[in-house]
Design a protein with these regions (language model features):
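Asp-based, Mg2+/Mn2+-dependent phosphohydrolase catalytic module
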Residues: 1-8, 99-102, 106, 115-216
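N-terminal helical cap/lid subdomain that shapes the substrate entry/recognition surface
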Residues: 3-106, 117
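Conserved G/P- and acidic residue-centered "switch" motifs that form tight phosphate/ATP-binding loops
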Residues: 13, 17, 112, 170
Length: 216
């Protein structure tokens, strides 16, 4: 890549990047559909990856009124909270990498489609809450990914130009959001393949953080 702006800030998605939560989310969606007596589409999981629950519901079930979509999203969040009590597991290498960034005083943020309640729980359980300068959640934005709002707010909170930020993302819609925001992206292959993430705009992809160091 030519004429790259020197990187100054780093932004992480949460689910599938900091925490290996995919199985909990898949099971929560399945439990939600069972509870309301609906059959999910075969590719339901891929449709929901990286999106706020309210927006994902509207894509999964045609013709829902806004209040009903919100109710189903609340059901999904309830099931996810129950399942997440089984334990929170970081993606391999995350604690060491984030600690190294903190020691190096690299501006760092989390920008997620999860609620603030879920984010706070995850970061506290991982022992990482104090390691992030800025967190932006679904509660803080009007538009979910692939809209760039969550990433632009994170960059503004860090006081770093978007072009000087690199994002770690596991979702195609998240990669698209970060690219529209003008940021560089490295894919994390916990939900999509490396080829899928690169086609969406990631410059490369990694399986986890065990071999990642700063500058990336």
């Amino acid at each position: 890549m030519k004429d790259l702006v020197p990187l100054r800030g780093i932004i992480f998605d949460m689910d599938g990047v900091l925490v290996d939560s995919g199985a909990h989310h898949r099971d929560a969606w399945r439990a939600t559909f069972r509870e309301v007596g609906l059959t999910p589409p075969p590719d339901f999981w891929r449709i929901t990856i990286g999106r706020p629950a309210d927006e994902a519901v509207a894509l999964l079930v045609d013709g829902l009124e806004r209040d009903e979509a919100r109710r189903l999203a609340d059901v999904k969040r309830r099931h996810y909270t129950r399942l997440a009590r089984r334990g929170t597991v970081p993606v391999a290498g995350v604690p060491a990498f984030v600690d190294a960034l903190a020691r190096g005083r690299v501006p760092r943020a989390v920008a997620t489609s999860a609620t603030r309640r879920d984010l706070e729980r995850v970061l506290v359980e991982l022992g990482l809450r104090s390691r992030f300068d800025i967190v932006v959640t679904a509660d803080d934005v009007r538009w979910g990914k692939p809209h760039p709002e969550v990433y632009l707010k994170a960059a503004a909170g860090l006081a770093v130009d978007p072009g000087a930020c690199v994002v770690f993302e596991d979702a195609v819609v998240g990669v698209q959001a970060a690219r529209v925001a003008g940021m560089r992206v490295i894919g994390v292959t916990t939900a999509h393949t490396g080829d899928e993430l690169i086609r969406a705009g990631a410059e490369r992809a990694v399986p986890d953080f065990r071999d990642v160091s700063w500058p990336v």
